[in-house]
Amino acid sequence: MINYLKSFFLYEIIRGLALTLKYFFKAKVTINYPYEKSPVSPRFKGEHALRRYENGEERCIACKLCEAICPAQAIVIEADEREDGSRRTTRYDIDMTKCIYCGLCQEACPVDAIVEGPNFEFASLTHTALIYDKEKLLQNGDRWEQALANKLHKDYEYR
C-alpha cells in the first residue's frame, strides 16, 4: 500500500528533482578541457623523446635494451659503429600506435636516453604521423629537456 501511495504522489520524481536541484547550484566538478588543464603527475608517461648531452651529442649508445624489453615491440633500432669504436643509432623508430606506455624502455635505458615526456596531446588523423623517427624524438627531447631533466632528478631516489 505504501508503495502505491509513493508512486501516486510522484515521490520518486520529486526526490530525483530535489537531487538535481541540490547539485545544480554547487561548484562544477569538471574542467573546461581545452581551455583549462588539470595538473599532470611528475611520473606521468606521455609522448616519447630522445635526450642529448650538454654538448649536443645524442645520449643513445645503441645498446638496444629498450627494443628488447618493449612488450609491444614498438621500437626498432639500427646501429652503426663510428670511427672511435663507439656505437650510435642510425635508425630509431617508435610506433606510437603499438606503444602501451608502460615505461619499461625508460627504465631499461642505462644512460637515460629514451624518456616519456609530459605531452599527452599528440593525436593525429594519419597512422604515419604516429610513427616517430629519430629526428622527431630528438626534437621532442630538445623541446622538453628542462622539464625532463627536472622530472628525472626528482625521481632519482626511487629508481
UniProtKB/Swiss-Prot annotation:
Keyword Ribonucleoprotein attached: no
Protein name (Swiss-Prot/TrEMBL): NADH-quinone oxidoreductase subunit I
Annotated function: NDH-1 shuttles electrons from NADH, via FMN and iron-sulfur (Fe-S) centers, to quinones in the respiratory chain. The immediate electron acceptor for the enzyme in this species is believed to be ubiquinone. Couples the redox reaction to proton translocation (for every two electrons transferred, four hydrogen ions are translocated across the cytoplasmic membrane), and thus conserves the redox energy in a proton gradient.
A biological-process GO annotation: aerobic respiration
Organism annotation: Rickettsia bellii (strain OSU 85-389)
Cofactors (names): [4Fe-4S] cluster
Alphabetized UniProt keyword annotations: 4Fe-4S, Cell inner membrane, Cell membrane, Iron, Iron-sulfur, Membrane, Metal-binding, NAD, Quinone, Repeat, Translocase, Ubiquinone
Entries under Pfam families matching the protein: Fer4_7
Cofactor note: Binds 2 [4Fe-4S] clusters per subunit.
Keyword Repeat: yes
4Fe-4S ferredoxin-type domain ranges (all copies): 51-80, 90-119
Catalytic activity line of the entry: a quinone + NADH + 5 H(+)(in) = a quinol + NAD(+) + 4 H(+)(out)
Domain of life: Bacteria
Binding site for [4Fe-4S] cluster 1: 60, 63, 66, 109
Principal location listed in the UniProt entry: membrane
The family this protein is said to belong to: Belongs to the complex I 23 kDa subunit family.
